[in-house]
Swiss-Prot record:
<feature type="zinc finger region">
    <location>
        <begin position="53"/>
        <end position="70"/>
    </location>
</feature>
<dbReference type="GO" id="GO:0043657">
    <property type="term" value="C:host cell"/>
</dbReference>
<comment type="subunit">
    <text>Homomultimer. Binds to single-stranded and double-stranded viral DNA. Interacts (via nuclear localization signals) with host importin alpha-1a.</text>
</comment>
<dbReference type="InterPro" id="IPR000650">
    <property type="entry name" value="Gem_coat_AR1"/>
</dbReference>
<dbReference type="GO" id="GO:0003677">
    <property type="term" value="F:DNA binding"/>
</dbReference>
<feature type="short sequence motif" description="Nuclear export signal">
    <location>
        <begin position="95"/>
        <end position="116"/>
    </location>
</feature>
<feature type="compositionally biased region" description="Polar residues">
    <location>
        <begin position="14"/>
        <end position="31"/>
    </location>
</feature>
<protein>
    <recommendedName>
        <fullName>Capsid protein</fullName>
    </recommendedName>
</protein>
<dbReference type="GO" id="GO:0042025">
    <property type="term" value="C:host cell nucleus"/>
</dbReference>
<dbReference type="GO" id="GO:0039615">
    <property type="term" value="C:T=1 icosahedral viral capsid"/>
</dbReference>
<keyword id="KW-0238">DNA-binding</keyword>
<comment type="function">
    <text>Encapsidates the viral DNA into characteristic twinned ('geminate') particles. Binds the genomic viral ssDNA and shuttles it into and out of the cell nucleus. The CP of bipartite geminiviruses is not required for cell-to-cell or systemic movement.</text>
</comment>
<keyword id="KW-1140">T=1 icosahedral capsid protein</keyword>
<keyword id="KW-0946">Virion</keyword>
<dbReference type="Pfam" id="PF00844">
    <property type="entry name" value="Gemini_coat"/>
</dbReference>
<feature type="region of interest" description="Disordered">
    <location>
        <begin position="1"/>
        <end position="31"/>
    </location>
</feature>
<feature type="short sequence motif" description="Bipartite nuclear localization signal">
    <location>
        <begin position="194"/>
        <end position="241"/>
    </location>
</feature>
């Protein structure tokens, strides 16, 4: 039996009561209203650190709307490494295009998985895939290979650091790894990958419209990938999204 009578069951009238509150938050009570009021309180009622160090939604020198570019691809990652450019944006007027030469990549979102082939999965081994998000300050020609940029001890990607000659040009912004293991009994043939970074990387193109690495003039974003096992490769199915704002100076 209901605790209160419904409006259409009230005696003496067939009209629905207009005095009732039928808003979605009306039945939650005063506790929810107080919580919402506290979360959405004005800025002057928050601590000073919230007022001093609040990061803007739109990067400085840029304007909205926020544009999104996605890169969906299956990668064959080997011991010698692989590279892809994730700041390739074609010039145009769409929500996935850049208006002019300059734009800012505010954040990068990487999600997907790394996995092994069925034949490799049965072998007893452990394989780690390492990812480097690198900023190329002076891009030219084609992206340099993994072995050209990084210095390794005994050709081991886990010991990779940027060569001294390229420390001013290539800057490692983020680095992470994921691990898979094979075997007949206790195998972990898949590993999920999910990363979200704020980068605020200001990219500059030349006068060309095509979104290619060769058309970059400043601050290209590169993603390097390499696995630690010398003979067993790993596959990576990734979806990489970058969130972009156009520059005001275009």
């Amino acid at each position: 039996m209901p605790k209160r009578d419904a409006p259409w069951l009230m005696a003496g009238t067939s009209k629905v009561s207009r005095s009732g509150n039928y808003s979605p938050s009306g039945g939650m009570g005063s506790k929810s209203n107080k919580a919402n009021a506290w979360v959405n309180r004005p800025m002057y009622r928050k601590p000073r650190i919230y007022r001093m160090y609040k990061s803007p939604d739109v990067p400085k020198g840029c304007e909205g709307p926020c544009k999104v570019q996605s890169y969906e691809q299956r990668h064959d990652i080997s011991h010698v490494g692989k590279v892809m450019c994730i700041s390739d944006i074609t010039r145009g007027n769409g929500i996935t295009h850049r208006v002019g030469k300059r734009f800012c990549v505010k954040s990068v979102y990487i999600l997907g998985k790394i996995w092994m082939d069925e034949n490799i999965m049965l072998k007893n081994h452990t394989n780690s895939v390492i990812f480097w998000l690198v900023r190329d300050r002076r891009p030219y020609g084609t992206p340099m290979d993994f072995g050209q940029v990084f210095n390794m001890f005994d050709n081991e990607p886990s010991t990779a650091t940027v060569k001294n000659d390229f420390r001013d040009r290539y800057q490692v912004m983020h680095r992470f790894n994921a691990k898979v293991s094979g075997g007949q009994y206790a195998s972990n043939d898949q590993a999920l990958v999910r990363r979200f970074w704020k980068v605020n990387n200001h990219v500059v193109y030349n006068h060309q419209e095509a979104g290619k690495y060769e058309n970059h003039t400043e601050n290209a974003l590169l993603l390097y990938m390499a696995c630690t096992h010398a003979s067993n490769p790993v596959y990576a199915t990734l979806k990489i999204r970058i969130y972009v704002y156009d520059s005001i100076t275009n």
